[in-house]
Amino acid sequence: MKLIIQIPCLNERDHLGATLADLPRSIPGITSIEVLVIDDGSSDGTAELAEQLGAHHVLRFARNRGLAVAYAAGVDACLHLGADIIVNTDADNQYRGADIPRLVAPVLAGQADIVVGDRRTDSLAHFSWLKRVLQRWGSNVVRRASGTAVRDATSGFRAIGRKAAATLFVHNRFTYTLETIIQAGHAGLAVANVAVETNPQTRPSRLFRSIGGYVRRNAAVIVRAYSMYWPVQTFGFVALLLLLTGLGLGARFLYYFAARWPQESGHTESLLVGVGAVVLAFLVGLMALLGDLIAANRRLSEQLLVQVRQLDLAVGRLGDGPTIPGLQRTTAAPWSDAPALAAPSLPGGARLALHPGDPA
């Protein structure tokens, strides 16, 4: 069972050393641990430092492409390198490496496809009250949109099984956290939570520079996800509101027309706005129909992409697959777990299988 820990980086030279030193060198049930550093166009020598500190793989971008792109490229590289489980963590040492064994345990046990580290944001000292409210609101919205029980939707500390990693695709460039959870719920993947601890903050968040901007961009991600996966419900709701508004204004015009005719012709403005609202309702209804047809085509396309990705990975394991641009293998040896280690216990007395096919 191979675990690859991926770390997206942008000018993290000052923090990467502590992050790598904190990672576990062995985990019961995992036979090989490797580290992939994704250098998102850093200008401070982050990639060179990663090699010096013993990272096993470095994926370099010539320029900054954004966190979501770096995350998705890292997942592709991990799959290409044969990872059975992928753990994503931050380069600023926000998350504790000691929590990784508990994070991967549900995936090892076959109880979850994705495990999200719950930071319990209500108790984080460096979170302002407004940030806590926004995090709670965002997680509630994502829970409803995804049909999962995720408690900390914006947490980037997560473990992903190979099947789930091959199924999910990131479409936006801002962040992957919300979109992948919504996709996972829509795809029927099992999402679990594990409470984790966080280290003291080492620098301000680069995604949360402006509260207004952060809310707008995350709201856009959620609206886009609703439009992609539930177009009939999303556009149908808007069309219904417009239709009811138009009919209400039309009824108002008829009431005043009947009450005051022939002295007055009624409130003509209500008639004009009402007709416009009904026309818009019809157009938005057509958008709902077209969105549903596009969604059906997208589902077929995603299924095809998953099959192509799995075929590419199978060919890659034979050594004949295409290489990933910018991916470099260093001289560091994988961290290996001794095969004699006992499997960790789970709540209720269950035990993890050390290898695929072993009885739990």
Please provide the spans of the model-predicted regions.
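Cell-envelope/extracellular polymer assembly enzymes that use nucleotide-activated donors
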Residues: 2-4, 34, 179
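Short hydrophobic beta-strand elements that form part
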Residues: 4-8, 37, 60
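Hydrophobic helical membrane-anchoring modules
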Residues: 171-360
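Short, well-formed alpha-helical segments that are part of the catalytic scaffolds
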Residues: 12-27
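Short beta-strand/loop segment that forms part of the nucleotide-sugar
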Residues: 31-41
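Acceptor/aglycone-binding surface of glycosyltransferases and processive sugar-polymer synthases
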Residues: 57-80, 85-87, 97-174, 178, ...
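Residue-level preference for short helical/loop micro-motifs built around acidic side chains
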Residues: 14-18, 44-48, 57, 69, ...
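A conserved acidic beta->alpha catalytic loop
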Residues: 39-47, 93
